[in-house]
């Protein structure tokens, strides 16, 4: 039966993965990831759970089966005692050099689910902490949620997936947009996946700016790719401005008709710099920006372009934006502005129902 399914990684996602030898081979090493049980309890009525794990060299002298079984069985019994059942537990015992067909991100372990169409591609996800989990999702034609204990933990995953399950987002088109912008000064391509998380591929030629853009996606709870070839032999002005315009357009397109979104976001404070942001996806562009910088540049990024970036993205998103920061370190102030923008955007684009969040009936 086709149904929403979560293909969940084990080590580093459900349970902590030791950084010393990357093996859970004793009860002493068994430690659940924070709030994984409450999250799975919230999700179990909406999704089928399938555990998919690579266990390098399982059954060999480097990782005997019996040393794996004891903590694994204890983990499974703990989940069962709390009302959490997995449809299957699928394990690849091979090492990368074995070149098998079942090691993630390859899909042979899940061949039954593929052949019998047992999962709904529109409402199923891979959840895991590694890039191979994201690649597995791509190979299956579904979305990925790349687990991180801070940036995308189990509380945030449950919040995201419950929103989808309750509003039956599977009947909607995926919130994705691609924008290509070419001028005499820049050649830009932006891709945005609002309902996915994972590795962001951002290359603008301005290192500090790349890092700031990554903060927006990471704290916004979505995934994006940005490539920009700009006239950096002059300066970075056109690169920053045109990237903001293209990103704002992509976000606006991905959000779509705004039906069901929260619309508003408000965050304060953030980090030691006391960054604050309020946002309304109102269709009426406006910005009020307040931050002062002592330095002309942070790395290869002109500090004066910070305000210009947020002005450009607010006007192309058609958003009302109030954003400010205060502090002593210019690097930290700029980074906190991008982070708080991402966190506020996360609130505003969150799906909460099916109604248009406006008394006027239009946004």
Swiss-Prot record:
SUPFAM superfamilies: HAD-like (SSF56784), Ribosomal protein S5 domain 2-like (SSF54211). One of its GO terms (molecular function) is imidazoleglycerol-phosphate dehydratase activity. Its EC number is 3.1.3.15, 4.2.1.19. It catalyses: D-erythro-1-(imidazol-4-yl)glycerol 3-phosphate = 3-(imidazol-4-yl)-2-oxopropyl phosphate + H2O; L-histidinol phosphate + H2O = L-histidinol + phosphate. One of its GO terms (cellular component) is cytoplasm. Residues 175-363 are annotated as: Imidazoleglycerol-phosphate dehydratase. CDD domains: HAD_HisB-N (cd07503), IGPD (cd07914). Zn(2+) binds at residues 92, 94, 100, 102. Pathway: Amino-acid biosynthesis; L-histidine biosynthesis; L-histidine from 5-phospho-alpha-D-ribose 1-diphosphate: step 6/9; Amino-acid biosynthesis; L-histidine biosynthesis; L-histidine from 5-phospho-alpha-D-ribose 1-diphosphate: step 8/9. Mg(2+) binds at residues 9, 11, 129. Its main location: cytoplasm. The active site is at 9 (nucleophile), 11 (proton donor). Its cofactor is Mg(2+); Zn(2+). The keyword Cytoplasm applies. In the N-terminal section; belongs to the histidinol-phosphatase family. This is Histidine biosynthesis bifunctional protein HisB. The gene is hisB.
